[in-house]
């Protein structure tokens, strides 16, 4: 189940006081339906994926409202993960270690996962500064020519979203509807709702839908593990390299992740 009031999390409240309010981030009913939509899409059961995604977006405004630009770009506690839109998330108290171990500008270029400016130019284009995700998550730091990835940086605040890791986003449901909708009007309406809440120019033609969906997955899910599986589902033979620049040629072997050693040691 999910609370009736929506995502009302009180900053500074004790864990007990906030316990029920955090249910919008747990694997609640709508998170299960969202996961169902994702799996149906992967299985190419498009009508079932569409129905499940529509059930989730039907409560978007009530339970998972769009994060505003002022919240995303707040100077003290920027909500870089668009937390109010998360259908399912995990709490990770050491989340900032992702940033300090791999992305902090305190590291030297050869010690960090540094994304070439050419990669960002390809996915964000000439209107990058209008995109809230670019403005909040990609920043030039002293000592580096390329932008550093700030999505998981330490907020130094008690904001409830400071330790959240996104698992399922409401935006993914709108992307699924855009991909599986029965007519172009519904498809454009669905993806444009996300674009409008990211500061991105709206689509006017369905001819751009496929390329825009690819572009949105690249921008929306960076650092969250979803992009790889989008590439795999679409069986893309070539993908952009986020670290080396240029493209990476893909095949069936590269799309199969190796099993962890802990799972193979005793087989």
Spans of model-derived segments:
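Structured, solvent-exposed acidic/aromatic patches
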Residues: 1-170, 184, 267
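Extracytoplasmic/secreted envelope proteins and their assembly/folding machinery
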Residues: 29, 50-53, 188-191, 210, ...
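Alpha-helical junction/boundary sensor with strong preference for TPR arrays
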Residues: 59-63, 198-201, 217
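Terminal alpha-helical segments
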Residues: 136, 183-185, 190, 203
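Long, intrinsically disordered, low-complexity segments
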Residues: 164, 206-267
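Active/binding-pocket-proximal capping segment
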Residues: 174, 186-198
């Amino acid at each position: 189940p999910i609370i009736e009031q929506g995502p009302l999390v009180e900053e500074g409240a004790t864990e007990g006081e906030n316990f029920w309010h955090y249910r919008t981030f747990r694997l609640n009913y709508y998170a299960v339906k969202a996961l169902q939509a994702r799996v149906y899409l992967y299985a190419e059961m498009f009508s079932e994926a569409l129905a499940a995604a529509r059930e989730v977006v039907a409560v978007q405004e009530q339970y998972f409202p769009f994060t505003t630009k002022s919240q995303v770009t707040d100077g003290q506690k920027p909500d870089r993960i668009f937390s109010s839109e998360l259908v399912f998330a995990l709490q990770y108290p050491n989340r900032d270690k992702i940033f300090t171990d791999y992305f902090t500008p305190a590291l030297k270029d050869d010690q960090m996962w540094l994304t070439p400016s050419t990669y960002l130019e390809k996915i964000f284009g000439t209107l990058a500064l209008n995109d809230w995700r670019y403005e909040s998550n990609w920043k030039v730091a002293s000592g580096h020519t390329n932008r550093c990835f700030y999505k998981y940086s330490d907020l130094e605040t008690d904001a409830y979203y400071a330790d959240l890791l996104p698992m399922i986003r409401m935006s993914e449901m709108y992307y699924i509807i855009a991909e599986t909708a029965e007519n172009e009007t519904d498809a454009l309406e669905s993806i444009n709702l996300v674009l409008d809440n990211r500061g991105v120019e709206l689509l006017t033609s369905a001819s751009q839908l496929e390329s825009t969906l690819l572009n949105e997955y690249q921008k929306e899910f960076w650092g969250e593990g979803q992009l790889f599986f989008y590439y795999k589902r679409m069986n893309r033979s070539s993908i952009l390299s986020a670290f080396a620049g240029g493209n990476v040629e893909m095949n069936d072997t590269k799309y199969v992740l190796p099993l962890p050693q802990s799972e193979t040691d005793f087989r």
